Curated annotation (Swiss-Prot):
Species for this entry: Acidovorax sp. (strain JS42)
GO molecular function term, any single one: ribosomal small subunit binding
PANTHER family: RIBOSOME-BINDING FACTOR A, CHLOROPLASTIC-RELATED
Known partners and oligomeric status: Monomer. Binds 30S ribosomal subunits, but not 50S ribosomal subunits or 70S ribosomes.
Family recorded in the similarity comment: Belongs to the RbfA family.
Lineage: superkingdom: Bacteria
Keywords attached to this entry: Cytoplasm, Ribosome biogenesis
Gene Ontology biological process terms in this record: maturation of SSU-rRNA
Name of the protein this chain belongs to: Ribosome-binding factor A
Subcellular location: Cytoplasm
Any single Pfam family the record assigns to this protein: RBFA
C-alpha cells in the first residue's frame, strides 16, 4: 500500500513562514534586557511539527545572551503561538544564533584588505 501523500506539499513551508511572522511580533513584546535587536532569519519545522529551529541574528546586543534568553522564553513564546496558529500541534521552539552575517562581514574585511594590499604592491612596481 502506498504512503499517503500530504494534501498540501507546501504546508510545512507555510507553517514555518507563519511561525516566523508571529514570533517576530511576540519577541518584540518580550521585556528581557538580554534580548538585543533580534532579526529572525528563518524557521525550520520538522515534518511532524513537533520541533522548530528558529534562526536569528542580532544587530545590537550579545548573540549568545540573546540565544539563552530566547530559549528560556521558548515556552512563553510557544504559548503565544498556540493562541495565534490554527494547527493541531504547535512545535517546541529551539532558538539558534545565526552567525552568517558576522562571517560575511569578516570575509568582506579580508577581501578589502587583500585588494588594498594588491593595489599597494601594484603601485610599488
Amino acid at each position: 500500500m502506498a504512503a499517503k501523500k500530504s494534501s498540501s506539499p507546501n504546508r510545512g513551508f507555510k507553517v514555518a513562514d507563519q511561525i516566523q511572522r508571529d514570533l517576530t511580533e511576540l519577541i518584540r513584546d518580550l521585556k528581557d534586557p538580554r534580548i538585543g535587536m533580534v532579526t529572525l532569519q528563518g524557521v525550520e519545522v520538522t515534518p511532524d511539527y513537533a520541533h522548530a529551529k528558529v534562526f536569528f541574528s542580532v544587530l545590537i546586543g550579545d548573540g549568545e545572551a540573546s540565544e539563552e534568553a530566547l530559549n528560556q522564553a521558548a515556552g512563553f513564546l510557544r504559548n503565544g503561538l498556540f493562541k495565534r496558529l490554527h494547527i493541531h500541534t504547535v512545535p517546541t521552539l529551539h532558538f539558534v544564533y545565526d552567525r552568517t552575517t558576522e562571517k560575511a562581514a569578516d570575509m568582506n574585511a579580508l577581501i578589502a584588505r587583500a585588494v588594498a594590499s594588491r593595489s599597494k604592491d601594484d603601485d610599488a612596481a
